[in-house]
Amino acid sequence: MHIKISTDFAIQNLHCTTMIRPLLRLCGQRTAATPFVSFFRPPKKPLSGISFARHYSPTKKPPSEVPTPTPGNYLVPITGPPGDTPRDTDLLIKSLTHKSLLPENNLVRCTVFDSDGNVTVASGEFKRTELLNKHGLLPRDLRKLDTGVNSIVPTILVRDNSILINLLHIRALIKADKVLLFDVFGSTDSKTQSLFMYDLGHKLKKSNKTMGSLPYEMRALEAIFISVIAALDAEMKVHTTVINGILSELEQDIDREKLRHLLIQSKKLSAFLQKATLIRDVIDELLDTDEDLAGLYLTEKKAGHPRAIDDHSEVEMLLETYYKHCDEIVQTVGNLVSNIRNTEEIVNIILDANRNALMHLDLKFQIGALGLAGGTFIASLYGMNLKNFIEESYWGFLGVTGVASLLTVWIIAHFLKSLRQVQRVTMTSDKKKAMKKKDTVAEKRRNHLRNWLTK
């Protein structure tokens, strides 16, 4: 449990602690183990809220459990788990410190495209509050585009005068005459991001005749979907090529290293399938909402002529086109996942068959050893220094040897026959087969008797 105290009160305690520490050193006391709360007497004026609970708490903790406050850290641990070390406590305090206290987290880096497709600001830094007030957004809307948050869930949000998009490597804010492309960490120098920015600037130009009469926001949307589908298609081809090569190699030889490689690629393919499925679902969800489809026409809304709720045929056709592309990618990857699962099942069957073959061979050796043990048992009986009354017999040796050999052969043949019967795997048991055979014989007899009586 942690209690958050006010900033002014914590800084005041810190200054007083700093002033008293030299006096404590002269007295030979340890300042690290002395709680800073004990340096102050209860205030003369009444306290309220958390400060009152802090000064007049009925449970007092030992000095070793109260840490020395540091600037920027105002979370004081009151209790901790058993066996908690000071290092773990410090890490917990640092992780619980809100990142909004840091000044650099109040800035957002983004590139701005104007109505002609030209870059007016390249990787500029803007304050969050400035973006929220200027574009009429809420803090929760900006969090969807926060470059510091590694979110795998894609989003397409339609607001009154803007469209928020978070798809793969693209996080953008589209307006009727402007596009803000937020910088994503680790993708500023990537080839995909560079190609997308070039294609976006080209499609936003008014002189571009290939886009037809689409409004500004539709051209930006199409450029974003083209980049997203191209990235998904390229990644799908890589996964397909690698996994098909592994599956073809497994058909020739089943190796542990190949199976391990298949496991790694299967995990990557599952993650890619989830990513593509989420993108397809977010487009499908947008297609099912007529209000959002009509709200995508930002240019007409800015001119004071918003579209009716059921008047969105152009943007619906645009979204359906890329929905089909994304669904095709999902189906292709799903078939590849099914091939991997089928291959895994076949490999397991082959390994089980090999294991059964080894067990069968081991049983044969054991049966042979059992037969030899039966023959040597007779030999051991005649090896004792006792009279057996056939010492002087001419046929004694041959008779004993023959009996031992016949016993050995009989044991081996009997158990091998039993092993072959166990190996037969049928859908019906032997009892059902015998009953079916008896029923067939009885039916034949009844038919024969019926024919004889009719004559």
Curated annotation (Swiss-Prot):
A GO-annotated cellular component: mitochondrial inner membrane
Region of interest (Disordered), ranges: 433-455
Compositional bias annotation for Basic and acidic residues: 433-444
Motif (YGMN): 382-385
Annotated organelle transit peptide span: 1-56
Keywords associated with the record: Ion transport, Magnesium, Membrane, Mitochondrion, Mitochondrion inner membrane, Transit peptide, Transmembrane, Transmembrane helix, Transport
Described function: Mitochondrial inner membrane magnesium transporter required for mitochondrial magnesium homeostasis. Modulates the conductance of the MRS2 channel. Involved in the splicing of mRNA group II introns in mitochondria by affecting mitochondrial magnesium concentrations, which are critical for group II intron splicing.
Assembly information from the UniProt record: Forms homooligomers. Interacts with MRS2.
Protein name, UniProt field: Mitochondrial inner membrane magnesium transporter LPE10
Native species: Yarrowia lipolytica (strain CLIB 122 / E 150)
Lineage, opening ranks: Eukaryota, Fungi, Dikarya, Ascomycota, Saccharomycotina
Name of encoding gene: LPE10
